[in-house]
Swiss-Prot record:
<dbReference type="InterPro" id="IPR036412">
    <property type="entry name" value="HAD-like_sf"/>
</dbReference>
<dbReference type="InterPro" id="IPR023943">
    <property type="entry name" value="Enolase-ppase_E1"/>
</dbReference>
<keyword id="KW-0460">Magnesium</keyword>
<comment type="subunit">
    <text>Monomer.</text>
</comment>
<dbReference type="InterPro" id="IPR006439">
    <property type="entry name" value="HAD-SF_hydro_IA"/>
</dbReference>
<keyword id="KW-0028">Amino-acid biosynthesis</keyword>
<dbReference type="Pfam" id="PF00702">
    <property type="entry name" value="Hydrolase"/>
</dbReference>
<dbReference type="GO" id="GO:0043874">
    <property type="term" value="F:acireductone synthase activity"/>
</dbReference>
<comment type="similarity">
    <text>Belongs to the HAD-like hydrolase superfamily. MasA/MtnC family.</text>
</comment>
<dbReference type="InterPro" id="IPR023214">
    <property type="entry name" value="HAD_sf"/>
</dbReference>
<dbReference type="GO" id="GO:0043715">
    <property type="term" value="F:2,3-diketo-5-methylthiopentyl-1-phosphate enolase activity"/>
</dbReference>
<protein>
    <recommendedName>
        <fullName>Enolase-phosphatase E1</fullName>
        <ecNumber>3.1.3.77</ecNumber>
    </recommendedName>
</protein>
<keyword id="KW-0486">Methionine biosynthesis</keyword>
<comment type="pathway">
    <text>Amino-acid biosynthesis; L-methionine biosynthesis via salvage pathway; L-methionine from S-methyl-5-thio-alpha-D-ribose 1-phosphate: step 3/6.</text>
</comment>
<comment type="function">
    <text>Bifunctional enzyme that catalyzes the enolization of 2,3-diketo-5-methylthiopentyl-1-phosphate (DK-MTP-1-P) into the intermediate 2-hydroxy-3-keto-5-methylthiopentenyl-1-phosphate (HK-MTPenyl-1-P), which is then dephosphorylated to form the acireductone 1,2-dihydroxy-3-keto-5-methylthiopentene (DHK-MTPene).</text>
</comment>
<dbReference type="GO" id="GO:0000287">
    <property type="term" value="F:magnesium ion binding"/>
</dbReference>
<keyword id="KW-0378">Hydrolase</keyword>
Length: 229
C-alpha cells in the first residue's frame, strides 16, 4: 500500500516552459548585479565559498564566479550552489508578483485529495528546497505548501542516482515499497525503481515509448490501488 507520494516539479506538476521561459531568464538577467551587490551577505558569501570548492578554485574572485555560474546555466548543470542562488533571486520575483508558480490545472485538487486521504506528500526536485517552497507557496492555485510534509533537493543526491532514493526512504523511515515517485523523466524513475520504489511517469506531451513505467497524462489518472507490494 502506498503511504507516501514524492513528486518531481518540472514537467510533472509544472509546465517545463514556466521554468525555462520565466524562471531561468529572470535569474539569468539579475545574477550579475545581484552577486556584485550581495557577495558579502552571510548566506551568499557561504554559497560562494562552496562554489570555489566545487570548481577547485579557492581564490577565484567574484567576476570569475559569475562567469562560472553563467556557464552552469548554459549547461543546465544541477549545481546545488547555482540552484540556491537562483532560488534567492526568484524569491524577489514571487514577492513582487512578477510571476506566480505554475501548476497544471488538476494538480492542486489531486494533491489536496491525497492529503485528505492521509497520504504524506513530498517534493524531490533539482531546484533548491527554498525555490520549491516559493513555487508552491505562490502558485497560481494558491498556497499549496500546507499539503506537503517536506522537500528534498540535490543535497540528497542527483535524481538519476539510486542512492538518492535510498537516502530519502531512510530519512522518511518508510519502506521503499510504500513509496511512489512521480516524474516525467524515465531515467529518474529507473533510479527510484532500482531503489525499490513504485513509479509513475507523467506524460504531458508525447508518450515515452522506451519507458517501462506506468504512464499517465494527469495526476487525476493515477490509481493508487494499482501499486501493490
Amino acid at each position: 500500500m502506498i503511504q507516501v507520494i514524492v513528486t518531481d516539479i518540472e514537467g510533472t506538476t509544472t509546465d517545463i516552459r514556466f521554468v525555462h521561459q520565466v524562471l531561468f531568464p529572470y535569474a539569468r538577467e539579475r545574477l550579475t548585479p545581484f552577486l556584485r551587490a550581495h557577495q558579502q551577505d552571510d548566506d551568499i558569501a557561504a554559497l560562494l565559498v562552496d562554489l570555489r570548492r566545487e570548481i577547485a578554485q579557492p581564490d577565484a574572485d567574484i567576476e570569475t564566479l559569475i562567469t562560472v555560474l553563467h556557464g552552469f546555466m548554459d549547461e543546465d548543470r544541477k549545481s546545488t550552489v547555482l540552484k540556491a542562488i537562483q532560488g534567492i533571486i526568484w524569491r524577489t520575483g514571487y514577492l513582487q508578483a512578477d510571476f506566480r508558480g505554475h501548476v497544471y490545472p488538476e494538480v492542486a485538487q489531486q494533491l489536496a485529495d491525497w492529503h485528505q486521504q492521509g497520504l504524506k506528500l513530498y517534493v524531490y526536485s533539482s531546484g533548491s528546497v527554498a525555490a520549491q517552497k516559493l513555487l508552491f507557496g505562490y502558485s497560481d492555485a494558491g498556497d499549496l505548501c500546507p499539503l506537503f510534509s517536506g522537500y528534498f533537493d540535490t543535497h540528497v543526491g542527483a535524481k538519476r542516482d539510486v542512492s538518492a532514493y535510498q537516502k530519502i526512504a531512510n530519512q522518511l523511515g518508510i519502506a521503499p515499497q510504500a513509496l511512489l515517485f512521480l516524474s516525467d523523466i524515465r531515467q529518474e524513475l529507473d533510479a527510484a525503481q532500482l531503489a525499490g520504489w513504485h513509479t509513475c511517469q507523467l506524460i504531458r506531451d508525447l508518450p515515452d515509448n522506451d519507458s517501462a513505467h506506468p504512464q499517465v497524462n494527469r495526476f487525476d489518472q493515477i490509481v493508487l490501488s494499482l501499486f501493490t507490494e
